[in-house]
Amino acid sequence: AILHLDAHMDLRIAYEGFTYSHASIMYNALQLPQITKIVQVGIRDFCEQEVEVAQSDRVVVFTDRDLKHEAFEGITWKQQCDTIIAALPQKVVISFDIDGMYPWYAPNTGTPVPGGFSFEEATYLLSKLADSGKEIIGFDLVEVAPGENDDWDGNVGARMLFHMCGVLAKNNKLHVGETIVFHK
């Protein structure tokens, strides 16, 4: 399965004439028999065609709006993460599009959209996945685009990549560091 953190569904059959584009990557992934499920988290921008594809029993969508509204009603991020992780089968690839985060974390990405994850929410979900007993078999981090006059996007992307490497190591029982606890 793919755990897909993104602002966009990326389920278009084609985008601007391109069958294999950033807007159709998850549609193309669904064409592979090895991909049994895509669990999308943080989605907040999509078209009608993508909604039709997402209604497949192989796609589970947790929109940013629904997650935020549940939080307003008292559902904790931990509870939401548990539900997201429960929707995944045993073997998981993480696909993280940086525009899944709040736009101020990656203002130079190609298609920023209001809303999204905080850095802490994203890293918490990934850490919970590492501890879940599911097997993380790979990951990617995409659409990180440092700006012309600053490296903020690159800084955030590098920190997320560092965390994702730690999540993969932890999931594979490699002891690469311990969490520092300042308060008991």
Where are these regions (language model features)?
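Active-site histidine-anchored catalytic micro-motif
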Residues: 1-41, 45, 132-136, 149
